[in-house]
């Protein structure tokens, strides 16, 4: 399964030391998994894979997963979520900004039998934006936007672009800078 994360960024000790972390589907829990699979990430180095998983008594080479429905063109009909557990701050700090992906979205969930659903969400931490990742390597997003606007204005003035196209391009550029560094639907 191709996953929207970086093993080196988020599971550094798995990559470097073969440490195993609990991983399981957190989506479609009412349906038993029907497939076995391994996980690969979206990074360019082809080194981001998880092919060892915690089992009841030992480890295993595959993870029980669900089939993910697609349309007739192979496009996913809905997202499929996996939980990576017990990673902690050390993994975040050591992974730093590898590949400029930055931090993934994170949810801190605690089990509590006194809660109606048996758990509560303590905190939701949003992942790194493209603008924040670029800022970490000294690119100012306001300056990038200013330069893009100048290029669009020149293209419009030279009749290479229509004003509506220019506005759409600038809107999309701004949305890209404020968007998540990982893939989004």
What does each of the following model-derived ranges do?
Residues 1-185:
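Charged (often Lys/Glu-rich) extended helix/loop segments that serve as interaction or gating elements
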């Amino acid at each position: 399964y191709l996953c929207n994360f970086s093993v080196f960024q988020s599971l550094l000790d798995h990559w470097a030391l073969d440490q195993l972390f609990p991983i399981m589907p957190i989506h479609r829990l009412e349906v038993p998994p029907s497939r076995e699979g391994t996980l690969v990430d979206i990074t360019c180095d082809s080194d981001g894979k998880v092919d060892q998983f915690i089992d009841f008594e030992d480890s295993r080479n595959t993870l029980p997963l669900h089939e993910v429905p697609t349309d007739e063109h192979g496009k996913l009909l809905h997202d499929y979520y996996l939980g990576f557990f017990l990673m902690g701050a050390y993994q975040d700090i050591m992974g730093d900004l590898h590949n400029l992906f930055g931090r993934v979205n994170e949810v801190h969930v605690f089990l509590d039998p006194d809660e109606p659903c048996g758990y509560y969400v303590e905190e939701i931490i949003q992942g790194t934006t493209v603008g924040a990742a670029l800022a970490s390597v000294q690119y100012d997003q306001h300056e990038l936007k200013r330069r893009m606007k100048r290029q669009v204005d020149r293209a419009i003035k030279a009749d290479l672009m229509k004003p509506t196209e220019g506005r759409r391009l600038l809107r999309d550029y701004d949305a890209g800078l404020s968007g998540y560094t990982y893939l989004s639907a």
